[in-house]
């Protein structure tokens, strides 16, 4: 983003990383009919917990911490699925201003699903083309469903138990979007304010 540049509309930048137990890679490639091998080290990271049979949440935390330090990123709000971060909640809370364990029920997520859907429709969701294939597969393989109580949920297009669609990256994107949504509602510091503060600190014009 160029200092002082004006943009006609906001954009939500999405970057996703998928995690998979190392020993399940071959079976996932065969079962999903998707060549995950092509994305190792970029869109996909392998976990070696329990000898490569389980997801290593501490490895995920370390990745989040490392990119924060490498790129000097300031985490304002982190939103997470409680089930997926059990054991590292306090660590995540320590590296951001606001840490939210997001209830994953349709009632709790419905308003955010509607809001994220509108951002997609308005063309406000941006990501690096050719570098988010796993994310794209999740988006094109999912559908927004309204249940009998009127609440929305994100579901696979196919509800068969043996289908090869994984929508986890989109579920994670929704949690990330909630953080952005809440930050905007709170009117926290924006990018222009942060840039101005940085310029003042270092004597810029």
Regions found by a protein language model. Give the residues of each.
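RNase H-like, metal-dependent nuclease domains and their acidic two-metal-ion catalytic environment used
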Residues: 1-104, 110, 114, 137-205
């Amino acid at each position: 983003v160029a200092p002082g540049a004006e943009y006609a509309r906001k954009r939500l930048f999405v970057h996703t990383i998928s995690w998979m137990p190392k020993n399940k890679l071959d079976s996932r490639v065969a079962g999903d009919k998707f060549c995950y091998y092509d994305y190792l080290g970029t869109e996909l990271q392998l976990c070696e917990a329990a000898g490569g049979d389980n997801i290593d949440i501490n490895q995920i935390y370390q990745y989040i911490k490392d990119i924060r330090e490498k790129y000097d990123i300031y985490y304002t709000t982190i939103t997470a699925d409680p089930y997926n971060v059990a054991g590292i909640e306090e660590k995540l809370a320590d590296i951001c201003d606001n840490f939210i364990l997001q209830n994953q029920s349709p009632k709790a997520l419905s308003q955010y699903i509607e809001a994220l859907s509108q951002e997609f429709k308005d063309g406000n969701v941006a990501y690096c083309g050719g570098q988010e294939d796993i994310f794209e597969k999740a988006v094109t393989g999912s559908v927004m469903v309204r249940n009998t109580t009127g609440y929305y949920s994100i579901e696979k297009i196919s509800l068969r138990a043996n289908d090869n669609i994984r929508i986890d990256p989109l579920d994670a994107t929704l949690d990330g979007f909630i953080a952005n949504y809440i930050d905007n509602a709170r009117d926290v510091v924006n990018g222009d304010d942060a840039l101005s503060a940085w310029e003042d600190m270092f004597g810029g014009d």
